[in-house]
Amino acid sequence: MIRVTGTAAPAMSVVFPTSWRQPVMLPLRSAKTFKPHTFLDLKGGKEMSEFHEVELKVRDYELDQFGVVNNAVYANYCQHGMHEFLESIGINCDEVARSGEALAISELTMNFLAPLRSGDKFVVKVNISRTSAARIYFDHSILKLPNQEVILEAKATVVWLDNKHRPVRIPSSIRSKFVHFLRQNDTV
């Protein structure tokens, strides 16, 4: 018990509960290891080695009070790179949304390695690390140009949602676009 006294106010007591416990700290989950393209069964279990690249430049309004890109902005960079990649293989996220379905990021893990500052040019690299019936797993890297310094590494899980926002299997018309892209990548 702590007793507080003073001349301006009457004495009062503050009692801390005796049953209070320190919170339990759970260990962080380790990075998941995936078998690539399990539902497509392509490439004999090899990863897609080609990255789709999008070049961008840091804008002043993306900076925080310390003069570096705010951490939350990197999620936008990753999502933009992913949308550009999907569009390059014939999947338009806006059209998917207008149809009532959605592609939603259900998990995003980012490892910040170095900062970006105003005016920096950089490239967002995106590839598919794995797919399942209802999910697509992406790997992202952000590299500062021109020296290719690694700024960020990220992993994203994207879920295909129906018009009631429930996870569903990726439609066969979309799945065929992944198959076409991966087969085309194999021949290059």
From Swiss-Prot:
Family statement drawn from the similarity comment of this UniProt entry: Belongs to the 4-hydroxybenzoyl-CoA thioesterase family.
Active-site residue numbers: 64
Keyword entries, A-Z: Chloroplast, Hydrolase, Lipid metabolism, Plastid, Transit peptide
Function: Acyl-ACP thioesterase involved in the production of fatty acids and beta-keto fatty acids. Can produce fatty acids of medium to long chain (6:0, 8:0, 10:0 and 16:1) and small amounts of medium to long chain beta-keto fatty acids (8:0, 14:0 and 16:1) when expressed in a heterologous organism (E.coli). Possesses thioesterase activity for lauroyl-ACP (12:0-ACP) in vitro. May play a role in the development of floral organs by generating short chain fatty acids.
InterPro entries: 4-hydroxybenzoyl-CoA_TE (IPR050563), HotDog_dom_sf (IPR029069)
Chain segment of the transit peptide: 1-47
One Gene Ontology CC term in the entry: chloroplast
Protein known as: Acyl-acyl carrier protein thioesterase ATL4, chloroplastic
